């Protein structure tokens, strides 16, 4: 089983690349955003718990997010592996994932970060915001706040996975095909 954690700042191309990687490697794509939307829309018990925090403008606790992710993993017992997109975002979540995966006889194979200069990513998101309808892609100040949050909470994961020799940085600038080629080169050599 191959399990890839794909991360990078908003606009780095994670969603676009995840589509290619899940097909090429027959992975189950687990997007935290999609999982949250499913649980909220279907008013699941975990969705109800998350909504209480969200309605108060608070971050959903690690335990709730992790429980949603575990539920989703358990729905795919025959998967060839997972592509985690948007999870883990914090050290607590990374540790929770490392505790859970061995219970299904697995572990994180690699963590791949799509890296790109903030100014290029801001331009990408503002451009995407013209057609995506996402309010958080249309406001440069909000985009920069998201980057600050990434730097504070998610960037420390680099050291965590480097210590396990599971971290790979990939240049996220170029055509979609060029970036896909860089990613597959890393995965093919694991």
Swiss-Prot record:
Q: Which GO terms describe its cellular component?
A: cytoplasm
List the keywords (alphabetical): ATP-binding, Cytoplasm, Kinase, Nucleotide biosynthesis, Nucleotide-binding, Transferase
- Recorded E.C. number(s)? 2.7.4.3
Q: Which domain of life is it from?
A: Bacteria
Q: Which PROSITE patterns match?
A: ADENYLATE_KINASE
Catalytic activity reads: AMP + ATP = 2 ADP
Task: Name any one GO molecular function.
Answer: adenylate kinase activity
The entry marks the following residues as binding AMP, namely 32, 37, 58-60, 86-89, 93, 134, 146
Q: Where is this region: LID?
A: 127-137
**Family as reported in the entry's similarity comment:** Belongs to the adenylate kinase family.
Q: What is known of its domains?
A: Consists of three domains, a large central CORE domain and two small peripheral domains, NMPbind and LID, which undergo movements during catalysis. The LID domain closes over the site of phosphoryl transfer upon ATP binding. Assembling and dissambling the active center during each catalytic cycle provides an effective means to prevent ATP hydrolysis.
Can you state the subunit structure given in the record?
Monomer.
Q: What name goes with this protein?
A: Adenylate kinase
Which organism is the protein's source? Flavobacterium johnsoniae (strain ATCC 17061 / DSM 2064 / JCM 8514 / BCRC 14874 / CCUG 350202 / NBRC 14942 / NCIMB 11054 / UW101) (Cytophaga johnsonae)
